[in-house]
Amino acid sequence: IGIGGALELATEEEVNIQMNTNFFGVVNMCKAVLPSMRKARKGKIINISSIGGVMGIPYQGFYSASKFAVEGYSEALALEVHPFHIKVCVVEPGDFNTGFTDNRNISEQTRLDADYGESFLKSLGIIEKEERNGCHPRKLGAAICKIVERTNPPFRTKVGPWIQVLFAKSKKWLPDAVMQYALRIFYAIK
C-alpha cells in the first residue's frame, strides 16, 4: 500500500494504515510461520521490501519508512533464526507496472497545500511515470522463484529497472550529499 503526500501533513490514521500493512503485515506473517519452521529446523522467509526501503523517496516517506522497517526487522530476524537453519531474504523491487500506481492513496491536504502542492504534484507525476513504465511483474516473480529454488540465496535481491538497481546499489559508496542531490534532481525538488 502506498500513501502519497508530505510527511508533515500525513494523518496518524494514514501512517498507521501504511505501517500496519507494509511492516506489521510482514511481522505477523513471520510470527505465524516461524514456530513450525523452528520445529522443522529449516525454512526460508522471503520478505518484500523496496528500493524505497534503501533510500527515502520524497512524498512517499511513510512508504519508505515502512520498507526501512522491513529491512531492519529482516536483518535482525536473519541473525535470530540462523541457529534453526532458517534463511531470511529480502527482495527490494524497483518500479513495476502493476496496479500500485492507480491504488495509491493521495493526500488531498498535500495536493492543495500552498507550500508543498506544486512540488508534490511534479514529484508524483515522475513517480507515476516511472511506475507505469516499470518492469513487467514477471521479472519480479522470476527473481523470487530463484530465491525459492536456491539452497543459499543472497540475503538481499534488488530487482527492477537497471538504472534504479544501480542507483540503489551506489548508496553504499556515494556520499549522502550526492545521493540527496541526485534524488532532488530526479524528483524535481528545487
Annotate each predicted stretch with a short phrase.
Residues 50:
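Residue(s) in the substrate-gating loop at a strand-loop-helix junction
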Residues 82-131:
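C-terminal beta-strand-loop-alpha-helix "lid" module of Rossmann-like NAD(P)-dependent dehydrogenases
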